[in-house]
Amino acid sequence: MSEKIASINSVVNSFIWGVPAMICIIGVGILLTVRTRCIQVRKFGVAMKNTIGKIFDKTQTRDGSMSPFQAVCTALAGTVGTGNIAGVAGAIALGGPGAIFWMWCSAFLGMCTKFSEVTLAIHFREKNKNGEYIGGPMYYIKNGLSKKWHFLAVFYAVFGVLTVFGTGNATQVNTIVSSVNTALMNFNILKGEPNSNVNLIFGIFIAALVAMVLLGGIKRIGQVSEKLVPFMAVLYVILALGVIILNIQRVPGVFAQIVSGAFTPRAATGGIIGSMFLSMKRGVSRGIFSNEAGLGTGSIAHACADTDNAVHQGMFGIFEVFMDTIVICTLTGLVILLAAPNISYVQAAGAELTISGFTATYGGWVSILTAIAMCCFAFSTIIGWGLYGSRCIEFLGGEKFVRPFLVVYSFVSIVGATMNLGLLWDISDTFNGLMAVPNLIALLMLSGHVKKLAIEVDQAEKDGTI
């Protein structure tokens, strides 16, 4: 059965992530960059000031909303996940070091794409019966385009619901149990193969935590995210910087390897496995899986923000992609490549490959810290995507379906704890591509609107409101 699913998925994935998809994703990013006059560069300083500078802002929010910082933390909770760890490792193993270069290119354009998504989400959002702000691609399609295009909103929401179970939950739980098993085996608590009982126990525990947070509503999601995301990011950055400092003499060579590998692709194992397009495909697809620019998902969380300034919140989107891909994904890639002489890329995969990079430098004890970081990354992603899925199901069927959906979503954590990692990543890649289609069409058609809103950045800066 799994072989048949893998075969079908392979055909669909090849089409979704083929040349047309690469052209569409990169093309929309270039178009938005041109129409906003490269806002991710022009206003980068403003974006940093209005994100990092707001970390300790404790301004009270209205009921049914999050603070702007809670919103960006929730969006980062959804984006800073296993794509930064297991996804980058997989991209390097299959596409070579050059995949990181294509992640950078994807992120540069993605910063503008995410800015556009967030700005449109705030501009076209609505309030539901509970007084909560609701927005995202479904709503900027519905409220920004004519009725004949509204089927795209339904299409997006349907694939959004399907995507959250794999991308948002199952793959994340799989990485949690994988990293925990690796840590336990490094300390000889487990012998040989990963223990299925450990996987099941962690699956049940995670499911209970997920239900407790998500069923607590938008306020609880925001409160958990604003505490968890900064902690996990700082912990991971410190660990990664330690590896870089201890291997500082090899860093220039690794960067040269990344750039040259982008145009002469070669797997980290040393064997030629394809053309430049393979490296590009792996880098761009994993980059999108990681930062979600082009998927529109992060804008769903940003739409909950207690702000009346769409462009101001759009600045958070620039920071989000920068932090996710340029910082954390790059650090992951450097950790793996700097530890390359001590790692078997054939035997290790996903999270295990990243953990091997840390243990090769620090020793086996660090697997506990990396397991904690990965558990935080994955759990935060599950929470963020739970919000995305609930908004999609609310758009399709109304608020009465939200709580039943969240119960089912929580239960999927148990299922995901015992599934095959490789097939999970492949299926998630496919659903990501399908979800991006209606969003990219909407961004293309609303690019003129984005241009008008982007002009407000300069005016707002002159007026002192940003």
What do the predicted segments below correspond to?
Residues 117-129, 241-257, 265-271, 304-307, ...:
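Extracellular/periplasmic helix-exit of transmembrane alpha-helices
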